[in-house]
A protein has these predicted regions:
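Structural signature of hydrophobic alpha-helical transmembrane segments
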Residues: 61-74, 117-130, 183-187
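Core segments of transmembrane alpha-helices
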Residues: 43-50, 99-107, 156-163
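Cytoplasmic-side transmembrane-helix entry/capping segments in multi-pass membrane proteins
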Residues: 90-102, 149-156
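Membrane-proximal helix-loop-helix units in multi-pass membrane proteins
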Residues: 105-155
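N-terminal topogenic module of multi-pass integral membrane proteins
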Residues: 6-89, 205-210
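Alpha-helical transmembrane segments in multipass membrane proteins, preferentially the mid-helix core
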Residues: 131-146, 163-170, 196-200
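Small-residue-rich transmembrane alpha-helices that serve as helix-helix interface/gating elements
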Residues: 180-196
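Hydrophobic alpha-helical transmembrane segments in multi-pass integral membrane proteins
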Residues: 51, 107-116, 159-177
Length: 210
């Protein structure tokens, strides 16, 4: 049986469209992979710089310490907003959408708490560490099948929640805490982001060489 030319042409065109769609999907997936790696490196770098500033200038100046304490949750809100936007938007990333809201509310709460005492500030950070940690854990679990290095994010989220409970307990002590109490928590976060970024970078390089 002879196949007509229009049918052959349509079949070839359809195959080309499928191949183009597949290629576009692969490129988009690769772009997201590279973005997430850069994102983790950026988060690690910011947290490391924040810790250094907190332990130096923040320990010498109350004004600098206050600014750093406000900036930290504000940055987390902005970072989650940008990351969600690069991965389908807030509607498709519910845990990050909630995290943006939680971090934004925390920023406002820190501003209010600074007018009271550092105990209040530490308590606010404790609640935030619990909620943001669990939300980070949820995001990592959701990304587990499609993105590498999420085991580090799961550990980070879990330890953040534990640290939050510890902060709340510390906040009730008579001794006034300082920004140094929070710097250790931020440093641990920087470590996990760096581990995840390096892990992903190594896997991506191996994949390109294969």
């Amino acid at each position: 049986m002879t196949v007509s030319r229009p049918y052959q042409t349509n079949t070839i065109t359809h195959r080309k469209e499928i191949m183009m769609t597949t290629d576009q999907t692969t490129v988009a997936s690769g772009d997201r992979e590279e973005w997430l790696t850069r994102y983790y490196f950026t988060r690690a770098a910011f947290s490391a710089i924040w810790v250094a500033a907190a332990l130096t200038a923040g320990s010498q100046s109350l004004a600098v310490a206050a600014a750093l304490l406000i900036v930290y949750p504000a940055w987390d809100a902005a970072a989650n907003l940008i990351d969600a936007g690069r991965n389908g938007g807030l509607a498709n990333n519910r845990s990050q959408a909630i995290n943006v809201a939680v971090s934004a509310v925390t920023t406002a709460a820190v501003i209010v708490a600074l007018t009271m005492s550092m105990n209040w500030v530490l308590g606010v950070f404790g609640l935030w560490a619990i909620f943001s940690g669990l939300l980070q854990l949820g995001t990592a679990v959701r990304r587990w099948k499609t993105n590498g290095g999420q085991w580090a994010m799961i550990l980070s989220g879990g330890q953040s929640a534990v640290a939050g409970a510890f902060f709340i307990a510390q906040a009730q002590m008579p001794e006034a805490p300082s920004i140094a109490n929070i710097a250790g928590y931020a440093g641990l976060g920087a470590f996990y982001f760096l581990v995840s970024a390096v892990w992903r970078s190594v896997k991506q390089m191996r994949r390109k060489r294969a």
